[in-house]
Amino acid sequence: MQRHMLKSKIHRAAVTHCELHYEGSCAIDEDLLEAAGLIENERIDIWNINNGERFSTYAIKGERGSGMISLNGSAARRAQLGDLVIIAAFAMVDEAELQAGWKPKLVFIDEGNKIKGHRDHVPTQNWT
């Protein structure tokens, strides 16, 4: 059996560009792509923390070290500059890979869209 699992996540990225008339996609700083294990043309889901919008598009490379998160084409209508977003990708993972210790790549970034940390799991949510 295969399970549809979270593969990659870039958490709380700030939108730096919205390019309505650019061919659709999301340009992501190449450093962030690599850290999250994402590649060009990979399907991504984007969740806008500011307004609750959720949509899918595909990743393209943004300038390395720039902090770029550019929503292009119709996706540009889903956010404003400075909105915080979560960018995620999922993968089909078989039971053997899961049992062998397969883990997602979670990337946490700062206010300038620079990497501030990595994790391979989402912590247990507690009621406190």
From Swiss-Prot:
Pfam families named among the record's database cross-references: Asp_decarbox
Keywords: Autocatalytic cleavage, Cytoplasm, Decarboxylase, Lyase, Pantothenate biosynthesis, Pyruvate, Schiff base, Zymogen
One Gene Ontology term from the biological process aspect of the record: pantothenate biosynthetic process
Keyword field contains Secreted: no
Primary localisation category: cytoplasm
UniProt-listed Enzyme Commission number(s): 4.1.1.11
Cofactor(s) in the UniProt record: pyruvate
Enzyme class at the top of the EC tree: lyase
Disulfide bond sites: none
Pathway given in the UniProt record: Cofactor biosynthesis; (R)-pantothenate biosynthesis; beta-alanine from L-aspartate: step 1/1
Compartment(s) of residence: Cytoplasm
Post-translational modifications: Is synthesized initially as an inactive proenzyme, which is activated by self-cleavage at a specific serine bond to produce a beta-subunit with a hydroxyl group at its C-terminus and an alpha-subunit with a pyruvoyl group at its N-terminus.
Catalytic activity: L-aspartate + H(+) = beta-alanine + CO2
Similarity remark: Belongs to the PanD family.
Protein name in the entry: Aspartate 1-decarboxylase
Organism: Burkholderia cenocepacia (strain ATCC BAA-245 / DSM 16553 / LMG 16656 / NCTC 13227 / J2315 / CF5610)
